[in-house]
Amino acid sequence: MEKLEMLYEGKAKQIYATDKADEVVIYYKDDATAFNGEKKGQITDKGVMNNKITSILFEQLEKQGIKTHFIKKLNDREQLCKKVEIVPLEVIVRNVAAGSMAKRLGLEEGTKLKTTVFEFSYKDDELGDPLINSYHAVAIGAATFEEIDTILEMTAKINNILKEAFAKENINLIDFKIEFGKCADGTIVLADEISPDTCRFWDATTGEKLDKDRFRRDLGNVEDAYIEILKRISK
């Protein structure tokens, strides 16, 4: 496998072409952003930790029947993945009220929800990734109803697998966001990453936040939170 030119650079990752048309290399950066890019900074070795965390979690999900774009971890910062067309939706899963949902609905952070909440945001930086529903998504051509059904079914399974896995490490999975992609044959697969950048992790005993909220809210010890998550899931 030969790494070629950069195809795309996002807030946290770079994507490179390879000598295989259907494979890409994803490089994880240390750059950190919050509030739709309004707050910017760096977290030491964040890219290394997120690459390792995502690789471990995607491998676990694959073993439990979830199709992903992940092929293998190449080194500390890079992984080899299937080339996919990203569905322009972020799927947000909320098990406990926190963050923007708590603020939007006037709920105290940490309030247990009577059911898991699934939300969509439309991936558009200029618009600030607005919340939309499935009808909006179909109306603007982001996905079909059939694709949305597949995505929601996969997301529910992913949530159950991750909640159980993290509970074993004394971590509550409060909420998270994931993305999906379409392979050349139209197959929907889990893409992007699962890491402290994209999840809220609270220690089940102390309630300590072990995720990017430490950067977002200036709580300090940001790197330590990422290290702790990697340490617990690496057992």
UniProtKB/Swiss-Prot annotation:
GO molecular function terms noted in the UniProt entry: ATP binding; phosphoribosylaminoimidazolesuccinocarboxamide synthase activity
Hydrolase found in the keyword field: no
Any Gene Ontology biological process: cobalamin biosynthetic process
Pathway: Purine metabolism; IMP biosynthesis via de novo pathway; 5-amino-1-(5-phospho-D-ribosyl)imidazole-4-carboxamide from 5-amino-1-(5-phospho-D-ribosyl)imidazole-4-carboxylate: step 1/2
Enzyme class: ligase
InterPro entries with a match to the protein in the record: SAICAR_synt/ADE2_N, SAICAR_synt_PurC, SAICAR_synth, SAICAR_synthetase, SAICAR_synthetase_CS
Record keywords: ATP-binding, Ligase, Nucleotide-binding, Purine biosynthesis
Catalytic activity: 5-amino-1-(5-phospho-D-ribosyl)imidazole-4-carboxylate + L-aspartate + ATP = (2S)-2-[5-amino-1-(5-phospho-beta-D-ribosyl)imidazole-4-carboxamido]succinate + ADP + phosphate + 2 H(+)
EC number, as in UniProt: 6.3.2.6
Keyword Ligase attributed: yes
Family: Belongs to the SAICAR synthetase family.
Matching PANTHER family: MULTIFUNCTIONAL PROTEIN ADE2, SI:DKEY-6E2.2
Protein name (Swiss-Prot/TrEMBL): Phosphoribosylaminoimidazole-succinocarboxamide synthase
Organism: Clostridium botulinum (strain Alaska E43 / Type E3)
